[in-house]
Amino acid sequence: MPRSFLVKKHFSASKKPNYSELESQTVYISPFIYDKFPVIPQPEILSTGAYYTPLVWDTGLLTTFFTSESDYKKSPISPSSSDDSSKPLDLTSFSSEDEGGKTSDPPSPASSATEAEKFQCNLCSKSYSTFAGLSKHKQLHCDSQTRKSFSCKYCEKEYVSLGALKMHIRSHTLPCVCKICGKAFSRPWLLQGHIRTHTGEKPFSCTHCNRAFADRSNLRAHLQTHSDVKKYQCKSCSRTFSRMSLLHKHEETGCTVAH
């Protein structure tokens, strides 16, 4: 390790370097540093024919596909085998060695159907062309029959997920209890709406009238009274109502048919 890394040197921040001590302040750049990097020539622009070479059939190369000259002369592409030189070549008679001398015929409809239905469900025997289609089928249909269910210990209801079962159990245990009257609820927001009945707070007001409500659902039901569409109709007097509860109240109080 150099000594400069082991010895501490204390420099004064107020002391500035004296550049006049240098023999010369001129900077020299050697012209030989660029000799090591040769200049890359510009690419030569070729004509269109250089990029798109025409396809030329050389019949002299076809002799390499035959074992002897006699086989080449007997072939249909030999010039001596046919007098008509303008007759097109029949390339379907040749095949590669890997295919064993068989021509590549188009697939039959039976083989196409087998290829399209190669993924089969082992539960309902339905077939699919892709593995993704088979997986989606199992997830939506077949898995629902074999899927593990979670049963409630308070009633006979069953749920697919454990989270849904826990939310249902709250309707039996009622963990949210009002400290004023002792009434219990299954959800915190139900308890919060109940506490407003004790405090008298009604933060949800109607924009059409001066009525206010402690719960948003009550305000939503009240807004239907201002709607022009009243789809609940009394069968006796043909009077229409915006809510089913208002129709039931009308029928319980006694419907008076005007004669």
Curated annotation (Swiss-Prot):
Keywords on record: Developmental protein, DNA-binding, Metal-binding, Nucleus, Repeat, Ubl conjugation, Zinc, Zinc-finger
Region spans: SNAG domain: 1-20
GO biological process, one term: regulation of DNA-templated transcription
Assigned GO CC terms: nucleus
ZnF region ranges: C2H2-type: 119-141, 150-172, 176-198, 204-226, 232-255
Pfam entry (one): zf-C2H2
Presence of keyword Ubl conjugation: yes
Location of this chain's protein in the cell: Nucleus
UniProt keyword DNA repair, yes or no: no
Disulfide pairings: none
PROSITE patterns assigned to the protein according to its UniProt record, in alphabetical order: ZINC_FINGER_C2H2_1, ZINC_FINGER_C2H2_2
Highest taxon above the source species: Eukaryota
Molecular-function annotations in GO: DNA-binding transcription factor activity, RNA polymerase II-specific; RNA polymerase II cis-regulatory region sequence-specific DNA binding; zinc ion binding
InterPro entries in the record: Snail/Krueppel_Znf, Znf_C2H2_sf, Znf_C2H2_type
Induction remark: By two classes of mesoderm inducing factors: transforming growth factor-beta (TGF-beta) family and fibroblast growth factor (FGF).
Family affiliation: Belongs to the snail C2H2-type zinc-finger protein family.
Name this polypeptide is given: Protein snail homolog Sna
Native source species: Xenopus laevis
Lineage: Eukaryota, Metazoa, Chordata, Craniata, Vertebrata
